[in-house]
Design a protein with these regions (language model features):
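Ribonuclease/tRNase effector modules and their secretory precursors
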Residues: 1-86
Length: 86
């Protein structure tokens, strides 16, 4: 899958201190892909990643209706149970 980062996503990488290689890994091999309830063009790629002794859920919002796919926004959270579908 080919993808690019939107300007906003690039800004979020810096603002949230996210590592690009981790984001790339999640997009290329996500543990889950869920639909965005508000926008059918957006798929949310997510994976649980351990950093130091803390588990984070990386959530990458990707516009899958355009080529190349566009990473619209992204973040990581410790609220895994809220978003991760088991």
């Amino acid at each position: 899958m080919s993808f690019i980062f939107s300007k906003h996503a690039e800004e979020q990488l810096v603002r949230r201190s996210l590592e690009r290689n981790v984001v790339n890994a999640v997009v290329l091999k996500p543990e889950q892909v869920v639909e965005d309830e508000n926008d059918e063009d957006i798929a949310i790629y997510q994976s649980i990643v351990k950093e130091d002794d803390t588990l984070f859920l990386y959530r990458i919002f990707v516009n899958v209706k355009v080529q190349p796919n566009v990473i619209v926004t992204l973040y990581k959270t410790t609220k895994i149970g809220k978003y991760y579908e088991s």
